[in-house]
Regions:
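Hydrophobic/aromatic-enriched cytosolic interaction surfaces used to assemble or bind macromolecules
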Residues: 1-175
Length: 175
């Protein structure tokens, strides 16, 4: 079992080294390599860390990516809970593909165009995915609140998936 973990670590190291060589080959210098969750937290705190509602309150950062979403709960700017949720924009795209009979690429274009035009055509296709995502977020909030004296007061959304038409309203109603 230990060899398996060492092999995973070696593959990850090789993967990172390949990316570093590409970046450095373009004349840029890498100062820091971060994991997704910490990168979102660092970017958020850099931009909003001095705001009173971030410095003194408990907030959640929900980064909705393609394959998965990251949820981070910060209490007075300090990370208290971080987890990956294996639901992302591609799940919505697949539901649209299933509903329309189109291939994944066409469904992705339909999803992107509906986000830009704020069309409601794909609400039914996205509802199940969004309710599952909201359920995972709510479960995380419940766990955090059972371990802490505070509760999440505000959610900040990021990631391409956060641009989906009606997402904020649906998450608000589910959570």
């Amino acid at each position: 079992m230990k060899c398996h973990h060492a092999w995973k670590g070696a593959r990850l190291f090789d993967f990172i080294n390949q990316r570093v060589k590409v970046v450095e080959g373009s004349g840029l210098f890498i100062n820091l390599i971060d994991i997704d969750s910490l990168a979102v937290i660092n970017a958020f705190l850099f931009n909003y860390g001095q705001q009173e509602n971030v410095k003194t309150k408990t907030v959640a950062l929900l980064n909705i990516g393609s394959a998965f979403s990251n949820l981070n709960i910060l209490e007075s700017g300090v990370p208290r809970l971080s987890r990956d949720i294996h639901i992302g924009g591609s799940n919505i795209t697949q539901r649209i593909a299933d509903a329309t009979g189109e291939n994944f690429k066409v469904a992705e274009e339909l999803k992107i165009n509906s986000a830009i035009k704020k069309a409601k055509d794909f609400a039914a296709a996205s509802d199940l995915v969004l309710s599952n995502l909201a359920s995972e977020v709510r479960t995380s909030f419940d766990y955090y609140e059972s371990q802490s004296a505070s509760s999440v007061e505000k959610i900040f959304l990021s990631g391409w998936g956060s641009l989906l038409a009606g997402l904020k309203e649906k998450l608000s109603s589910y959570i």
